[in-house]
Amino acid sequence: GPALALADATVADDADVSGGTVVGVGASVGGGATVFGSVLFDGAAVGEGAVVRDSILGRGAIVAPGAELHDAVIGDEAYIGVGNELARGIRVWPGTRLEPTSVRFSSDV
């Protein structure tokens, strides 16, 4: 389904944003990223090649390139580092910083 990008949002030409995703004011989606059925609040950022499905990113939250989120809620100003895979309804507190490859949950279970 269609996606909605609000004022000053940036979505790379080769990003796949669909499934009713809302990209908030000033939020961004990098090249090659996939965002489906998700909400990116104002100023949130999804890095190149990241995958975000059925998730919520709080204001100013950052998902680093190549990270994957499936059914996750990420608090305001949180940072999800490269190589993290979050799934199964995981919640990340506002301001939390997950260093690269520190969390890996399979979304296949």
Which residues make up each language-model segment?
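Left-handed beta-helix
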Residues: 1-109
